[in-house]
Amino acid sequence: LMFHDTGKLDRLGEPIMKVKLREPSAKLDAFMDWAEDVKGPVVVFSQSVGMINLAAARLDASGARIGVYTGQTPDRVRQSIIDDFQAGKLDFFLGTIKAGGEGITLTTSSTMAFFDRAWGPFRNKQAEDRTHRAGQKNAVQIVDFFAPGTVDSRVRNTNIDKWATLKLILGDDREGV
């Protein structure tokens, strides 16, 4: 998995990253090891459709019941994926942060994983809040798959700095503001 900065910014001023996916992937291997042991339905997010598709292929090959929710998912099937996940018919909901990170409820899960994070902490917080909603009965565990010294690590540190600055400006010390 290789991330390259395109030197361009999206409409929110966040760097646009180009992802080259490679197999084998240590990150995907670590995720699959973790996924074998995790209990209950799991929500998985990434910025990359390619990463979601790779994970979906691996999970499908392992016999897991999966739903994929990206910008490429037809509108007519999006709600059925959410409904199936909420009804316990799927083990994994895999989605991109942009497509699935806002406006949907995934409270049947109390476990969430991120392959990578958006540059903007608000997008990440919105994605996290898909499980932190009215109707959630359990504490939610959030797992990030990243390695030190990588772009993922840089994104993580940038988001931590952005939250710290925001808290300083607002005078708010609550987690996630």
Named regions from a protein language model:
Residues 1-93, 98-104, 170-177:
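Conserved Helicase C-terminal RecA-like lobe
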Residues 104-117, 140-144:
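A short beta-strand element within the Helicase C-terminal
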Residues 119-177:
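A conserved SF2-helicase RecA2
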Residues 39, 89, 109, 137-139:
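A structure-centric signal for secondary-structure junctions around beta-strands
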Residues 47, 98, 118-119, 147:
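Structured loop/turn residues at secondary-structure junctions
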Residues 55-57, 104-108, 125-126, 156-157:
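Short amphipathic alpha-helical segments
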Residues 70-74, 116-121:
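Short, acidic/turn-prone active-site loops that include or flank metal/cofactor-
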Residues 93, 112-113, 131:
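Short, well-ordered beta-strand core segments
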